[in-house]
Amino acid sequence: MTASSRLRFDIEDAPSDADVEVLPNGLEAFNESKWPGHQQWRPLAVFARDGESIVAGLAGETYSGWLFIRYLWVSDALRGRRIGRKLMGDAEARALERGCHSAWVDTFSFQAPGFYPKLGYEVFGELDYPPGHRRIFFRKHLEAKAGAQVYASE
């Protein structure tokens, strides 16, 4: 270990990719030592297409029993037609098939903060970000619907 008296602290506005890459590599090595297999992320996407065009969709990942919804988008022309609800339901069903017990998503106050509670999501955190708005974090415990078959494969 380098003696602390010889450490130099550099503040950089344009760090190299190689220098920045040292950080997640070190963190991942530490995390793996405490939580083996934590990096077993599986992509999950649901798309609504009109012909060859994607007009709505959801993209996220499942890992360690959780579904993370990274993106949910419905084109302006289709909003209000329950397309988002269908995308979320399909993703949650697949997450259950993969053995997930919960889901989480975040949105901004100018996007769809009223949508997720209608689907059973509850707020677990908020940030005053970006200025003049809020970033809101939601979670939900997933439960299989009556009569649905669920296979734990993750």
PLM features per residue range, with description:
Residues 87, 111-112:
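Conserved short alpha-helix immediately C-terminal to the canonical SAM/SAH-binding motif I
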Residues 23, 116, 121:
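Conserved active-site tyrosine of GNAT-family acetyltransferases
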Residues 95-109:
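Conserved GNAT acetyl-CoA-binding A-motif
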Residues 7-70, 75, 110, 125, ...:
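Acetyl-CoA-dependent GNAT
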Residues 104-106, 122-139:
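Conserved catalytic-core motifs of GNAT/GCN5-like acyltransferases
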Residues 80-93, 118:
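Conserved acetyl-CoA-binding loop-helix of GNAT-fold acetyltransferases
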